[in-house]
Swiss-Prot record:
Pfam family, one: Peptidase_M24
Enzyme category, top tier: hydrolase
Catalyzed reactions: Xaa-L-Pro dipeptide + H2O = an L-alpha-amino acid + L-proline
Protein name as it appears in the record: Xaa-Pro dipeptidase
Entry EC no(s): 3.4.13.9
Keyword annotations from UniProtKB, A to Z: Dipeptidase, Hydrolase, Manganese, Metal-binding, Metalloprotease, Protease
Gene: pepQ
Gene Ontology CC: cytosol
Length: 443
């Protein structure tokens, strides 16, 4: 395999080309990209955990250091001012020397407010990209050049097309997340609480809670019906029914986002439903290809949900077509089939149809779908269908003309299990779809 250093060199060349095009289109001389700053908790003297500007980590795998600055013009070697204070209160990251530093000019920045004297004197034509607009104004950046929408739209659109370096990083993130999922399943099988399962996951991935790309969803039993459940009970339930784990990892700033669901017993209806959702998810991925709208795959999976609702007699005496047409599948899968993935978990540009930022909203029937793009080579997306038993969504169907088609007794029996979600991360190639998750043999 090609080394990360050579892949990174090509990655920088791609970013330089995109930058040249963006600067020419919007008549700017350079972009000043800010890693971000620490922000203190209200009325306190300690900061919130630092989260780096994703446009910054697109260029350099520096994810834990605030007060850094990148100056890029698409022609000259990118210039990185790396924050290196004299500080005996806090850990100070050393000046980096790694696979990527040959392609970036790295300069120590001893004082957070010292960047002003190091930048070009003429700044009227420099664009600022970062989370602290007031800092840009202090540096003399024109207000109209602070996070300019056209530039961001352009950069975001092309972030959809991953370089080989980015794909290599995402495959490494997959490996870490897969290790975590295996450790978490073992912890579940041994009867641990959600809190302790989460610790097992973090230990296996080598992450802290603040390192993972999103808060882990560690849901036992009925908690699996809460789509973004992050509470973490300290006490294990008296009886284990099910375990849904939605948890990822990060490598060089790039995310993995995986979900698996397990039944405590292998011989009940729920266990068979888990298997069937898994099989249908794999069957959908097998149909995916470049040139097709992501929306089409979402709609297709509602048809697959209808098939499972009928097979398991959760909905009765109704055709699968009628279920989808009348949205009886909606309360069982209330979220989208997935989303773009990359530097951010819900990566940017899911609705952008071109590099001018033309927006195509999700269909009115499926408002929570996060992507309406035509699939193209280089895109990375999640495929994460589910079936849930959520009372607040089912309640409106308990009355009315369709109520008789719901097998309420079966639904009540399944509610203690919460729900099911199966999520893989896939790469669209010209002639195939790579399933990074299954390639690592995560069942």
């Amino acid at each position: 395999m090609e080394s990360l250093a050579s892949l990174y060199k090509n990655h920088i060349a791609t970013l330089q080309e995109r930058t040249r095009d963006a600067l020419a289109r919007f008549k700017l001389d350079a972009l000043l990209i800010h890693s971000g700053e620490l922000f203190n908790v209200f009325l306190d003297d300690h900061p919130y955990p630092f989260k780096v500007n994703p446009q910054f980590k697109a260029w350099v795998p520096v994810t834990q250091v605030p007060n850094c600055w990148l100056l890029v013009d698409g022609v000259n070697k990118p210039k990185l001012w790396f924050y290196l204070p004299v500080d005996y209160w806090h850990n100070v990251e050393p000046l980096p020397t790694s696979f990527w530093t040959e392609d970036v000019e790295v300069i120590a920045l001893p004082k957070a407010d010292g960047i002003g004297s190091l930048l070009p004197a003429a700044r009227g034509n420099i664009g600022y990209i970062g989370p602290v607009p007031e800092r840009a104004l202090q540096l003399g950046i024109e207000a109209s050049n602070i996070n300019p929408k056209g530039v961001l739209d352009y950069l975001h659109y092309y972030r959809s097309f991953k370089t080989e370096y980015e794909l290599a990083c995402m495959r490494e993130a997959q490996k870490m997340a897969v290790n975590g999922h295996r450790a978490a399943e073992e912890a579940f099988r041994s009867g641990m609480s959600e809190f302790d399962i989460n610790i097992a996951y973090l230990t296996a991935t080598g992450h802290r809670d603040t390192d993972v790309p999103y808060s882990n969803i560690v849901a036992l039993n009925e908690h699996a019906a809460v789509l973004h459940y992050t509470k973490l009970d300290h006490q294990a339930p008296e009886e284990m029914y099910s375990f849904l784990l939605d948890a990822g990892a990060e490598y060089n700033g790039y995310a993995a986002d995986l979900t698996r669901t397990w039944s405590a017993k292998s011989d009940n209806d729920y266990a068979q439903l888990v298997k069937d959702v898994n099989d249908e998810q794999l069957a959908l991925i097998a149909t995916m290809k470049a040139g097709v709208s992501y929306v089409d795959y979402h709609i297709q999976f509602h048809q697959r949900i209808a098939k499972l609702l009928r097979k398991h007699q959760i909905i009765t005496d109704m055709s699968e077509e009628a279920m989808v047409e009348n949205d009886l599948t909606g309360p069982f899968m209330p979220h989208g089939i997935g989303h773009p993935l990359g530097l951010q978990v819900h990566d940017v540009a899911g609705f952008m149809q071109d590099d001018s930022g033309t927006h195509l909203a999700a269909p009115a029937k499926y408002p929570y779908l996060r992507c309406t793009r035509i699939l193209q080579p280089g895109m990375v997306l999640t495929i994460e269908p589910g079936i849930y038993f959520i009372e607040s969504l089912l309640a409106p169907w308990r009355e009315g003309q369709f109520s008789k088609h719901f097998n309420w007794q079966k639904i009540e029996a399944l509610k203690p299990f919460g729900g099911i979600r199966i999520e893989d991360n896939v790469v669209i190639h010209e002639n195939n779809v790579e399933n990074m998750t299954r390639d690592l043999k995560l069942a």
